[in-house]
Amino acid sequence: MLVVAFAITLPAVTPRIYASDEIQYFSYLRSLWFDRDVSFENEYQYFFDQNIGRGEGFYATFLEHYTEAGRRPSFATIGSAILWAPVYLAGDLVARMAGYERDGFSYPYVAAVAYGSACYGFAAILLSIAAARRLVGDGMLAGILVWIGTPLLFYMYVSPPYSHACSAFAVALFVTVWLRVRESWTIGGAIALGLAGALMAMVREQDAILAVGPIVDFVGYLIKSHVTRDSSVSIYQSSRGPTPARGSLAPSRSAAAAGAADSPTGINHWQSGTATVHRLVLVGLAGCVAFALGFLPQLLAYKALNGHYGPSSMVTRKMTWTSPHALEVLASPAHGFFIWTPLAVLALVGLVVLARRGTPVVRPVALCALLMVAVQIYVSGSVESWTVAGAFGQRRFVALTVLLTIGLATLLKVLQGNALRPVVGIVIALCVWWNVALIAAFGTGLMNRQKLEPRQNAYVAFVTLPRMAPDIAYRYLFSRESFYRNRRAEP
């Protein structure tokens, strides 16, 4: 049913490129596909000539400067291009059959990338639901709420050529593989995890730091094996055991049985056996080698584009590693993640609850998930452009979709039968509407795109937009160009 619901929403996807980030990520794919290089000058010039790349500073940044390798700079990475390649091929076939110009820029190519991003965003939701079900027994409602109640919705439907929907997918895939691999920590599993981590890092460089969660988890397992010389720990809940009490964080009997079908011993536990430290060291090395090999496309692209095996110096010099804006990136009234996306607060509360009240084998996962959130906050607070002014939401946190789903699923689980459940339900509904309303206000010009103004935003969300909702919905479905006609492109 969820797949059918997503299919029904596909007409809401906007096949359009307008921002500099979208241009950079799209140019990566177009240049590799048609020119077989990472020289983006012709792509940048095309968008500038089409009055698309006309945001403040676009020409000066991308059509005047050169890298050390003598190419026009790009702050994008290759991962989104890799993920978009299959749908871009479909777009090329459509262009050939339908008589569109086969130049890599025409409508079928842009539409392919846009719809591809939407599909990857939806895949992220499916993986997130599966991860939550694996840990707490249910995740469907939490996944739907995170889908609608976070900026992922915007980057799936309104501005899909950004990398954020792909980022949500890559991180969700990485976490899903981790949850499966940690049951046994085999060499094959470590290779899969390393490759998933490489994809995650190639989609967005910042997301590479999320590997710290599984790394800490693995090191903890390695230390435990070294100290005890016995990695056997009983499964937290046998599928033949008693049915969990309402609100318990142990997965239901059916969920446990489903997990048992996925692996020989069930969900998410330290594998029984006689694994040696020597074998685990080999497992760790296999994961590292797999990551290095998987990341090779990005390293080669760095070298060809920047003249060295690393990001542009224009990126690295924007970082202040003391993270002076860590608190602001969360709680600034004008730019904070929690103000843009209050549903995230409830989700993080859920992760804390899982870390404190989860079963012994689930608590380490929750603690590692909280560590992953913390390092994402740290990096986001280290970037000079931490405000991400002009974009919708604290978009760098879209990568945490899977972790937010797990946290929210936990909160919903523990509130079963609790007198506070209706109150929390109302709060969740308000959080979801807040996100939808901000998207509408952002698209219609009813808010300042450079910053939040909470009091004014609240008035628009709860007074103005309900009256305008029918007209906005009609325009979005049947006259979408009316939202951006004659609007100057933004960086």
Regions found by a protein language model. Give the residues of each.
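Membrane-interface alpha helices of multi-pass inner-membrane proteins
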Residues: 29, 143-144, 189-204, 211-215, ...
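Hydrophobic, aromatic-rich transmembrane alpha-helices
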Residues: 126-127, 219, 226, 278, ...
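Transmembrane-helix signature of polytopic, membrane-embedded enzymes
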Residues: 95-107, 123-150, 169, 183-193
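Transmembrane alpha-helix segments characteristic
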Residues: 2-5, 142-146, 292, 359-383
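Membrane-lumen/periplasm interface segments of specific transmembrane helices
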Residues: 213, 218-224, 281-350, 368-380, ...
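Specific aromatic-rich, kink-prone transmembrane helix
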Residues: 127, 166-184, 189-197, 213-220, ...
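Perimembrane helix-loop-helix junctions
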Residues: 210-291, 346-361
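Aromatic- and kink-enriched transmembrane "portal" helix at the membrane-lumen/periplasm boundary
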Residues: 101-124, 143-173, 177, 198-207
